[in-house]
Regions:
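Extracytoplasmic metal-acquisition and chelation regions
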Residues: 1-120
């Protein structure tokens, strides 16, 4: 998982360089994470960059995201996001709705490239 987060960090660096060409220096890249563990991992990768604003979608005490329902506030936050970092692997059942609503949003799934164990 740490390798995925590091890869996501490299992706954010690339996005930062690309967005710097398009945006003014006062604008920041907005990164949203799906839940608190992803937020902490992203925070550790991003560090103290003044070019990236990091937000978390769900409350820190939110448990399992399998049954999480997006709120209007969540959709508003995602509408301003450049990047959405999620766990993937089916944890975020709302992910297809987000991808459909915001086709230009870059979605990074931390489980990409990992062979997941089938629990059945």
């Amino acid at each position: 998982m740490l390798l995925c987060i590091a890869a996501a960090g490299l992706g954010l660096t690339t996005l930062s360089v690309r967005h710097q060409q398009v945006k003014t220096e006062e604008d920041k890249i907005t990164v949203v994470t799906s839940f608190y563990p992803m937020y902490v991992a992203a925070m550790n990768v991003i560090g103290d960059s003044d070019q990236i604003e990091l937000e978390n979608l769900s409350e820190p005490q939110t448990g399992c995201l399998h049954d999480y329902q997006l709120t209007p506030e969540d959709m508003k936050l995602l509408s301003t996001a450049d990047v959405f970092i999620v766990n993937g692997g089916g944890i975020e059942s709302f992910l297809s709705d987000v991808a459909e609503a915001y086709p230009d949003l870059t979605i990074i799934q931390a489980t990409d490239g990992i062979d997941l164990v089938d629990d059945n």
